Design a protein with these regions (language model features):
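FAD-binding core of flavoproteins
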Residues: 1-87, 91
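Alpha-helical interface subdomain recognition
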Residues: 39-44, 58, 64-195
Length: 195
């Protein structure tokens, strides 16, 4: 289809003359350098023809080909972040120095239920992601598109919910720089609109 052959992808090494990082972007106020997005300026940049990937007009094809694996990668990152948040939630819940009304935090209110729900939701996200990855490996991105679309929605939402619960059990400390939770929440929130 000609309309999908209008773009090309070219590798441009960062040390190429004329390539300039104007500034790194922040994510909810957190510096995302060096792995995040940047405002770039390209002034009369020249690269060898060999830097053209796959061939002229095949940029859309490359982008589409990486979407499925990229989304699975992001979901795996979400699951890893949620696992860390759940572990922090559990530790905080049984910390003997954090007691209220004679009970540890896990036994107050709905905290015990939140911990259990988080484990269930996290396992569901993990199994859906593994299923999507297995299907992509065996039958390809196009046939696995439904499973990949499901995890793109489900895994980041589950991770955000679990991180939010972990923040809640940590109280004010959860939104501070004393734990990784606030940063995790900010970066995880960006996964919902990407891809």
């Amino acid at each position: 289809n000609a309309k999908h052959q209008r773009h090309s992808m070219i590798l441009v090494p960062m040390d190429t003359e004329g390539v300039e990082i104007k500034k790194m972007m922040h994510v909810f106020g957190y510096d995302d350098a060096p792995h995040g997005h940047a405002h770039m300026k390209f002034t009369n940049v020249r690269v060898p023809k060999d830097n053209l990937l796959l061939g002229e007009g095949r940029g859309f094809e490359i982008a589409q080909g990486r979407l499925g694996p990229g989304r699975i990668h992001h979901c795996m990152r979400a699951i890893g972040s949620a696992e860390v948040a759940l572990e922090l939630m559990c530790r905080r819940g049984i910390d003997p120095s954090k007691v209220a009304f004679g009970k540890n935090l896990a036994n107050l209110g709905a905290n015990y239920d939140h911990i259990a729900e988080s484990r269930i939701e996290l396992n569901a996200a993990r199994f859906l992601t593994l299923d999507a990855a297995a299907k992509m490996d065996t039958v390809g991105n196009k046939i696995a598109a439904s499973e990949i679309a499901q995890i793109k929605v489900f895994a980041p939402n589950v991770a955000l919910k679990i991180i939010d619960r972990a923040i809640q059990i940590h109280g004010g400390e959860g939104v501070s720089q004393l734990t990784p939770l606030a940063s995790m929440y900010a970066h995880m929130r960006t996964l919902r609109p990407v891809s």
